[in-house]
Amino acid sequence: MTEPNNTDLLDLATPYALHAVSIDERFEIDRWLATAPPEVADAFTDEVRSVQETMAVLSAATATEPPAHLRDNVLAMVADDPVRDLGSARRRRGGESRWRTAVLAAAAVAVVGLGALGVGLALRPAVSPTTADQVFAAPDVQTVSGPIPGGGTATVVFSKERDAGVLVMNDVAPPKPGTVYQMWLVGSDGPHSAGTMDDKAISPSTTAVLSDIGTSQALAFTVEPPGGSQRPTSPAFAELPLT
């Protein structure tokens, strides 16, 4: 493996997290991390943690280990980026690694397919799991992740072409009694409700399909009264860009 620059090193975080590198390659990556700038090493660690947490969605949602074929499917998706050539990899989609897009999309779709939507989310009418499959396979599939105040992360795998997305929330605390989390698809004409989550809907790993994302520029989260609101009544406590 050719010694990477800092951007290339971050591209190696997902195959590293998936144990999709050889022992020798893992040793080389560890050596490069030891001499990398602190901010790069921290970003690498955060990326590894994010991938591992997302893969853990499968076991949390089904009380079983992730299907053995999932890792093979992810690796097959990126077969044109061989591990031994990752030193020449480049960030794609404005900084989004194809490895990371593949694993996050695969994990989210696998969860939906295994029935993780049966958590009682008060979303708009349920969308067939095939919608998630279409998002996963879409040529314009993208992922975006961000921290949730108070702990946990939210990830959206989405496709504007398929007009849908898959939301995965890891280790997010439930709303306080007497309140709900409400999701909003935010576009040029303002926010539109994408559903609510009460304390019973939130689990260590919560997954939902988002439909009709249209030209929405962001997915925002607010705290609202039970049943939700027609318009946000509090500032967004988290927001993920959908552009």
Swiss-Prot record:
Membrane topology value: Single-pass membrane protein
One Pfam family recorded for the sequence: RskA_C
Keyword Transcription: yes
An annotated Gene Ontology molecular function: sigma factor antagonist activity
Protein name: Anti-sigma-K factor RskA
Function noted in UniProt: An anti-sigma factor for extracytoplasmic function (ECF) sigma factor SigK. ECF sigma factors are held in an inactive form by an anti-sigma factor until released by regulated intramembrane proteolysis (RIP). RIP occurs when an extracytoplasmic signal triggers a concerted proteolytic cascade to transmit information and elicit cellular responses.
Signal peptide start and end residues: none
Ranges for region Disordered: 223-243
Residues in the Extracellular compartment per record: 124-243
Main subcellular location of this protein, as a coarse class: membrane
The gene coding this protein: rskA
Compartments reported by the entry: Cell membrane
GO biological process, one term: regulation of translation
Domain remark text: The cytosolic domain interacts with sigma factor SigK.
Keyword terms of this UniProt record: Cell membrane, Membrane, Transcription, Transcription regulation, Transmembrane, Transmembrane helix
Residues in compartment: Cytoplasmic: 1-102
Family per record: Belongs to the anti-sigma-K factor family.
Classification via InterPro entries: Anti-sigma-K/W_factor, Anti_sigma_zinc_sf, RskA_C, RskA_N
Gene3D superfamilies: Anti-sigma factor, zinc-finger domain
Transmembrane segments: 103-123
